[in-house]
Structures are given as structure tokens and as C-alpha cells.
A protein has these predicted regions:
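A conserved regulatory-domain signal marking ACT and ACT-like small-molecule sensing domains
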Residues: 1-176
Length: 176
């Protein structure tokens, strides 16, 4: 393979068995490789986000075949050229978990604190779980962070503690 090219491929549409197989088969038939992926069912919709690599010819094939496959399967499919991931040299990997009674604004409030300190959110997942005894909807946010090595962690922890205390949320922040 010559120089590697990269595409981010996203697909959203009604969930049904076989979608992952169909999409990964299309990528393989195009002569490309599926490197990184995130897939989930959100509501009744299947959502996919993948990093595909290959030579320029393969990337063109993924775009052409992907459009046809999306049409056939009723998926909104989008491709976008990108570059390979650069190693994060000046960042420390951390994980955060925030838990609280569900209400609008939790993701916004937490990520505003992180952005204000120059912290990059590398990945984020959230979900609702119901408390066993009360049945209360609990919101759980989990994220992988890239914290600038020059950032004073004590300041970040203090700000997160202040916000979480105001909102009655629990949080943990640890290396990883």
C-alpha cells in the first residue's frame, strides 16, 4: 500500500441486525481498513463513527460504495477526509466520572469547566441508570481526558468540586 489516507465515516439510521457486517464488508471490499470505531444504538437509531484507512483509490471506493450502501440500507452516511492521529505529547491521560440525578445541563456544565482549563475531551459516554430502590433516573457521564501537563491539577479539581457541590453531583477524576 502506498501513502495511507484516512476517512472518518459516519452512519445513522434505523437499527436492525446486520448493519455492522454490511458496513465492514463494504470497507473491506473497497480495499480499506477499519482502524477505530464507535457504534451504539441511541433510541431506535443505529449510530456508527469509524476511522478508515487505505490508499487514495481505496478511499474513493469507500466514498462511492458507502453512498450506494447508505441509500440501499436507509442510512445517512457521510465521509470526511482526515489525517492520522498525532501523539499527544504535552497531555496527561485522565478519566472522569460524574453521577447525579438526571436533568438538562450536566454535560454542558462539566465540559465548560474542562474547556475553560484547556482540557481536551478525547471520548465521552453518558447514559441513564435507575436507582435500584427509588427508581430515580441517575445520569452518568464518563470521559477520557487529555489534560495539559502544565495545568495545575489541584485547580481543576477545586473547580470541578465547586460545580459538583453546587449541583449535588458526585465525581471522580483519576489517571488513565
Amino acid at each position: 500500500m502506498g501513502n495511507k489516507s484516512y476517512l472518518v465515516l459516519t452512519a445513522v439510521g434505523p437499527d436492525r441486525p446486520g448493519l455492522v457486517s454490511e458496513i465492514s464488508s463494504m470497507v473491506l471490499a473497497a480495499g480499506a481498513n477499519l482502524e477505530d470505531s464507535r457504534m451504539a444504538i441511541l433510541g431506535g437509531e443505529f449510530a456508527l463513527l469509524v476511522l478508515v484507512s487505505g490508499d487514495e483509490r481505496a478511499m474513493g471506493e469507500v466514498e462511492t460504495r458507502g453512498a450506494a450502501l447508505g441509500e440501499r440500507l436507509g442510512l445517512r452516511l457521510l465521509t470526511k477526509a482526515t489525517t492520522s492521529r498525532q501523539a499527544a505529547r504535552d497531555f496527561l491521560p485522565f478519566q472522569i466520572r460524574v453521577t447525579g440525578v438526571d436533568r438538562p445541563g450536566i454535560v454542558q456544565r462539566v465540559t465548560a469547566v474542562l474547556a475553560g482549563r484547556g482540557v481536551n475531551v478525547a471520548s465521552l459516554e453518558s447514559r441513564l441508570e435507575f436507582a435500584p430502590e427509588s427508581g430515580t433516573a441517575m445520569f452518568i457521564l464518563e470521559a477520557h481526558l487529555q489534560i495539559p501537563s502544565a495545568l495545575a491539577l489541584a485547580d481543576l479539581r477545586r473547580e470541578l468540586s465547586r460545580v459538583c457541590e453546587e449541583e449535588s453531583w458526585d465525581y471522580t477524576l483519576g489517571e488513565g
